[in-house]
Amino acid sequence: MARLTRLLPLAALVLSACSITPPKGPGKSPDAPQWRQHQQEVRNLSQYQTRGAFAYLSDQQKVYARFFWQQTGQDRYRLLLLNPLGSTELELKAQPGEAQITDNKGQQYTGTDAEEMIGKLTGMPIPINSLRQWILGLPGDATDYKLDDQYRLSQMNYSQNGKTWKVIYGGYDSATKPALPSSMELTEGGQRIKLKMDNWIVK
């Protein structure tokens, strides 16, 4: 599979080199009932989709793309990475126990671990298994996190397999109920992943 460095337009100015900074001021307690209620409302979402801009930045490669994320059921989701012309560079379909990736040449790969497959095929170690929760503003398995003044996830640290990811949320889309993230940044060592969500559709 040709690595996704072809996706690299400098047109992705929406994801500039500047970093997201967490909101200033005191956050709310993770023990607050408002936070528990928000988490439950998000978990109750059975289907949702979002699209936006994606960037992966490291010393080895810089990748910019459009993305489309669709959750169709419990542990069933689809991820598309698109080039600036709108053509699909990578499609991931996942369901319990099975993941399938199709590259830009139509070659298909199947396996059981979507995260491992994406890392091997693209050279981008995206923590997709955790990102499924993080993109919704849920901590997943992370226990080291902070809330903003609206009882929503503000930032967190998550360590697994010798890596520690730091996640910072740049804002939330209050037009959706419950409010869902509008931008986020993940950093680990010398690599950075940035996501900017244009909009959300929830059911």
Swiss-Prot record:
Cellular compartments annotated: Cell outer membrane
| InterPro entries hit by this protein | LolA/LolB/LppX, OM_lipoprot_LolB
Residues lipid-modified (S-diacylglycerol cysteine):
C18
Note the superkingdom of the native organism.
Bacteria
Its encoding gene is what? lolB
Q: Which CDD domains match?
A: LolB (cd16326)
Pfam families to which the protein is assigned, alphabetical: LolB
> Lipid link (N-palmitoyl cysteine) located at?
C18
Instruction: Please give the GO cellular component terms listed in this UniProt entry.
Output: cell outer membrane
* Name of the molecule in the record: Outer-membrane lipoprotein LolB
Q: Which residues form the signal peptide?
A: 1-17
Keyword Membrane applies: yes
One GO BP on record is: lipoprotein localization to outer membrane
Fill in the subunit field for this protein: Monomer.
UniProt function note: Plays a critical role in the incorporation of lipoproteins in the outer membrane after they are released by the LolA protein.
Principal localisation: membrane
Q: Its family?
A: Belongs to the LolB family.
Q: Which UniProt keywords apply?
A: Cell outer membrane, Chaperone, Lipoprotein, Membrane, Palmitate, Protein transport, Signal, Transport
